[in-house]
Amino acid sequence: MNRSVMKWLMLAVGAGAAFGVSAQEAEVMVEAAAEVASGISTAELAYALDTFYFLVSGAFVMWMAAGFSMLEAGLVRSKNTVEILTKNVALFATACIMYLLIGYNFMYTEAGMYFPGLDLILSMEDHAADVVNAGGEDAPYYSSLSDFFFQVVFVATAMSIVSGAVAERMKLWAFLGFAVIMTGFIYPIQGMWSWGGGFLGETFGYSDYAGSGIVHLCGAAAALALVILVGPRKGKYAADGRVNPIPGANLPLAALGMFILWMGWFGFNGGSELAVASVDSANNVARVFVNTNMAASGGLLAALLMAKFRFGKADLTMAINGALAGLVAITADPLSPSAGLATLIGVVGGVLVFVSILFLDKLKIDDPVGAISVHGTVGIWGVLAVLLANGDATSWVCGLPKRKKPKASTSSNAAWKPIPSSSRANGTVNAARSYAAGLLLRRVEWGRVFGPALFRVCNVDGRQSAPRQATALHCQLFISELERLP
């Protein structure tokens, strides 16, 4: 009998006993559990658990739609509350339909492509379970339909970013018309470049764990374009350049929206681990949850302190945006950093969102909820912050193959193991130094002169710890490139 399966079934029996099942009934349940367990393989159980985890994570991300709705309704004027709520509920339905009809097949096409092929309407046939039953090393570890559900709520998230930025200025039907284009074409195409096996992921090794760039920066870029087109709200900016604050009508509602988003982000980042049925995957999910929570906390306090220093008092809206900025910042890689580094990444995000909001006001770019700053400015920081704990994210620079987690593998995920955090921490400074110096030296004739010195800096006194060995290899590859210069 499979011991793993038996453990789960015995746990269920124990739970039943706790709720008043008699000893005789419990014995019958144990016998039934043993009979069921004898016919279930570990692969089947892992498949069921990973699929269930995927679906629950997707449900958490869907709940973020409520968070965006509450946040935006709280930060706009009361006369526009119904309109902003209507936009949010309608955009979610629009995103689901467009991603079903076009978007999903656009996003997941042939590897290495710049433009996707055209294959309309998602097929409801799911042969993943058959493959699991057949066994083999390439057996998937979750249902492909659960993957669609998880991805479609990401699309709705990207479009929700746009709705807040253009609040109080864009008519409903014009907004929904853009939502059709955004969710059916724009988001899937740029998502295909990376997550869908396109050129960014396959050729350049671009790393974005849960979508700081793919989801949040995409939504912010679209929001910025629309905000520039529709212009600021009437009365927002005076003729002499002064900024006239337009406070939100319901800050308690905005705070509720922040906490809903904070909660949903655990599914957003945690679900992007793609599996939970193995020990490694379960530990990774726990690490992602902790780092996500710490980054949000760091971002909130950083923005709150910045407001205190700048305005002389605490500002709730800045604190809310600081928490969201911390979440966006850690989304690109919530797995690799330590909890302390994740907090620091969130702190930088909180500072950046404060500065960005004030800077956009100077440019007379009116963003009622701070969406462009939270998801755009901090989204860029999140993508760059990947290098702080994961040097492999830039392996394409010197031609090294990038280690990545496969789209589908066995339940144990044996093909993908994270680098120990201690090795990552020790090698971060050396790797960053070699990358930056190598990029510069490759382009100048003096590279041959400074190449050997670069190698010595990266490999001080011949010490060959694991991170230094990796860094020395990078330096050697850079030097070989330098020697090819004319």
Region spans (language model):
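Positively charged N-terminal leader segments that act as targeting/secretion signals
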Residues: 431-467, 471
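Short, intrinsically disordered C-terminal tails of secreted or membrane-associated proteins
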Residues: 480-485
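Hydrophobic alpha-helical transmembrane bundles of multi-pass membrane proteins
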Residues: 2-434
